[in-house]
Amino acid sequence: MATDIEQKVMEAKMASIVLASVDTQTKDNALEAMAKALDANRNKILEANKADLEEAERMKNEGKLSQALVDRLKVTDPKIDGMISGIRDVIKLEDPSGRTINTLELDKGLELYQVSSPIGLIGVIFESRPDVVPQVMSLCLKSGNATVFKGGSEALNSNRVIFNILVEALEDTPGIPKGAFQLMETREEVMDILALDEYIDLLIPRGSNDFVKFIQDNTKISVLGHADGICHVYVDTNADLNKAYDVCFDSKVQYPAVCNAMETLLINREIAEEFLPEMVRRYEEVGVELRFDEGSYAIAEKLGSANIAKATEDDWKTEYNDFILSIKLVDSIEEAIDHINKYGSHHTDAIITENKTKRKQFIALVDSSSVMVNASTRFADGFRYGKGAEVGISTNKIHARGPVGMEGLVIYKYVLLGNGDKVATYAGDTPRPFTHKELDSKLSDIINE
């Protein structure tokens, strides 16, 4: 007999089959209803979040919750505005499902279509951030995927209220199957979800390194995501130092509690004496704790800086998610690239240089899902990449990589349109040859005639 959790997941799986065939206009109508519902229920959301924040502060004071998680938990009116605009941005995006990717004529009257289609049922397990619910639900809905959500206990009230507001809006929209979106709330349900590989097609974990690694290590379901966000900026000998100051400051300080914030600053030794003093001053003004290798420590020590320490080997492997930064001097761009590929997490890394040859070298050799040239690592984000929003950032090398929007929530199927055709015609002693000619026709035009 199925458990309550399995029953909910089965219901979502059945709904995913129906949702895959819902037309774009119906999905867009549902998304607009979701946006309006969030706007109309602001006070309810803020009240629920206030209760979560009070409990989170207590847990932080007891050492059970980090400041980074508390920061991610907070919902404000501007954040609700962001949720609403994010949903409406998804409405503007092209429906990724049902698109003809390629068309190939195998023979006259025998045409093969490669067509995008929803993955099916997505499981989203996340910590702290309540804005994950509208963000991911909108992307999954538009791409035709049903979704099972499991949020962290620290955001229980916020997640529940936001989820219920959105689901009620969907239930009032004709054409959207009921049960396509489910919310799980207890800690025990995580292990149950991880075991349901019979129904769930893809898992997307959003949270700390340990959290994501736990998910990856305890399920047979395919996992889209990244465990670490150890991002670097390398300041080259040919850098415009004014650009370097701005990019390095923004990459660390603009919002340090996220996975695309810089954790290690690499500086070419030739320019360190000129560059580092001003950079240290800017960081110290906002309270960034700095951890230096031997070479950079010697320079910082001359400045009389108080908030400095020597870096250890562990610092190069650490995602701080805080106002902490490790700094290292390197002798060449090759050494910088080697350090990034050894200690980085293949997430986002940047170079500051005006040299075209070094720019090309860095782009080609840094093995990361996003590579920035003279720009902040903080740009590695689905919204900023024009995806409307993102379901997560993937450092995988198959299916989807980097900030993953709706294009990462579809796969494809092959559809062959024939007229009683047989393989026997194209086999044997006198086989008929295939034409294998590319065509411009779209499957949607054919089946909607």
Swiss-Prot record:
Entry's Gene Ontology molecular function annotations: glutamate-5-semialdehyde dehydrogenase activity; NADP binding
Pathway involvement of the protein, from the record: Amino-acid biosynthesis; L-proline biosynthesis; L-glutamate 5-semialdehyde from L-glutamate: step 2/2
Pfam families cross-referenced by the UniProt entry: Aldedh
CDD domains linked: ALDH_F18-19_ProA-GPR (cd07079)
EC code: 1.2.1.41
Class of this enzyme: oxidoreductase
InterPro entries: Ald_DH/histidinol_DH, Ald_DH_C, Ald_DH_N, Aldehyde_DH_dom, G-glutamylP_reductase_CS, Glu-5-SA_DH, GPR_dom
Primary location recorded for the protein, binned into one broad class: cytoplasm
Alphabetically ordered keywords of this record: Amino-acid biosynthesis, Cytoplasm, NADP, Oxidoreductase, Proline biosynthesis
GO terms for cellular component: cytoplasm
GO annotation terms (biological process): L-proline biosynthetic process
Compartment(s) where it occurs, according to its Swiss-Prot or TrEMBL record: Cytoplasm
Catalytic activity: L-glutamate 5-semialdehyde + phosphate + NADP(+) = L-glutamyl 5-phosphate + NADPH + H(+)
Similarity-based family: Belongs to the gamma-glutamyl phosphate reductase family.
Function: Catalyzes the NADPH-dependent reduction of L-glutamate 5-phosphate into L-glutamate 5-semialdehyde and phosphate. The product spontaneously undergoes cyclization to form 1-pyrroline-5-carboxylate.
Name under which the protein is recorded: Gamma-glutamyl phosphate reductase
Lineage: Archaea, Methanobacteriati, Methanobacteriota, Stenosarchaea group, Methanomicrobia
Gene: proA
